[in-house]
Amino acid sequence: MQKRHFEMETDGFYGAYWKCKTDSDCAMIAMIGDDSEDYLARTSVKWLHKLGVNVMTMSPAKKDYGHHNYPLERIEKAISWLKTHGNQKIGIVGASTTGTLALTAASYFEDLTLTIGLTPSDFIWQGFMQGKKDGCKEWPIEGESLFSYKGEPLPYMPFCYKHPDYWHVIEKETKRTGDMINSRKLFDDSETAHPITEEEIIKIEKIHGTLLLIGAEDDVLWDTAKYIRRMELRMKERPHTCRLESVIYEHATHFVFPESMLETIIETDRLSEVVF
């Protein structure tokens, strides 16, 4: 697959553009995976190319696994580049934290007319970093939000657990439940300690076009089913122009990728075993 790489220093955002072989005037900003050119990102490109869609993969930075004060201007610049390079219809898709980012960006930029949030939240929370620190793999960053705009952090729900208790709670719950990772208690306890305010809620009623929300009851990272139901209620209570579609599965965990995309992942994995 041919791509054009983008760097913060020269382009204002980190990502890669993958043009579809067919002549398409549609593009998706895909924030799937930890890096814009990693395994999951490339898989999402292959899947979207099969649908005849150009793809702009994006991530915070090369091998940057945290999310803190991510400037929405980066997505704004990516939209501008896509428009000047023949894309008339632009959508955005994200999963997990980037699902929340997709909703937030779409509520700011009306050029996004298809928004897909896979296991998103309906609010913005405190920024965090991943790596290694005092024996912890993840920790919250004081005074920082997940996202920022025009140099200011967006209002956010603070975590009630500070470093290192933040990670210890996740670690303890993961061990207790036997899950790969379990952070649901972290989010539930934080919302109990600090009920979500209107300023922290994503204004999904400002989203244009079509909004698709997908989650599962058995999500153990956070209660995305509750968050999606709150968004459904919000849309009923407020005037809006977008069309909302939502699906909540009973069993799908935190990773609710389409079956055909999962098949692409398996195919790619088998191919890599043969090639390498």
Describe the residue ranges of each PLM region.
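Conserved alpha/beta-hydrolase "acid-adjacent" motif
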Residues: 39-40, 220-230, 257
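Short glycine-enriched nucleophile-adjacent loop
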Residues: 99-110, 115
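Short amphipathic alpha-helix adjacent to the substrate-entry channel of hydrolases
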Residues: 40-58
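Short beta-strand/loop motif that positions the catalytic acidic residue
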Residues: 207, 213-215
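Accessory cap/linker subdomain of secreted extracellular hydrolases
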Residues: 117-203
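Catalytic nucleophile-loop/oxyanion-hole region of alpha/beta-hydrolase
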Residues: 58-91
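N-terminal cap/lid segment of alpha/beta-hydrolase-fold proteins
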Residues: 1-26, 265-268
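C-terminal catalytic histidine-bearing segment of alpha/beta-hydrolase fold enzymes
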Residues: 191, 195, 214, 229, ...
